[in-house]
Amino acid sequence: MAGQKIRIRLKSYDHSVIDSSARKIVDTVTRAGATVVGPVPLPTEKNVICVIRSPHKYKDSREHFEMRTHKRLIDIVDPTPKAVDSLMRLDLPADVNIEIKL
């Protein structure tokens, strides 16, 4: 797989889970003999939802809820077949969204 690059994007609502998953990916791929760039922290998306506290009136009384999406980027430069195979077998938590591009 000479000259190729694998780009992995991780998304999660919990920053500790995404950091441990990124660390696990980097350790697995470096043990398989490929070079890794990252994990690079990407900007955190902050989604704020505003709702009225009362069911009928009192529009001045509102409550804000926010949902933060943490993202990380990992590049695998010149991946070996052993590294790709170990990536496929890797077990990661369910609350981490993974996008892999070649």
Curated annotation (Swiss-Prot):
Gene coding for it: rpsJ
GO biological process, one term: translation
HAMAP family per record: Ribosomal_uS10 (MF_00508)
Biological role stated in the UniProt entry: Involved in the binding of tRNA to the ribosomes.
Protein family (similarity comment): Belongs to the universal ribosomal protein uS10 family.
Protein's recorded name: Small ribosomal subunit protein uS10
Keyword Ribonucleoprotein set for record: yes
Keywords assigned: Ribonucleoprotein, Ribosomal protein
One of the Pfam families matching this protein, by short name: Ribosomal_S10
PROSITE patterns named among the record's database cross-references: RIBOSOMAL_S10
GO annotation, cellular component aspect: ribonucleoprotein complex; ribosome
Annotated source species: Clavibacter michiganensis subsp. michiganensis (strain NCPPB 382)
Subunit structure: Part of the 30S ribosomal subunit.
Source lineage: Bacteria, Bacillati, Actinomycetota, Actinomycetes, Micrococcales
An MF annotation (GO) of this entry: structural constituent of ribosome
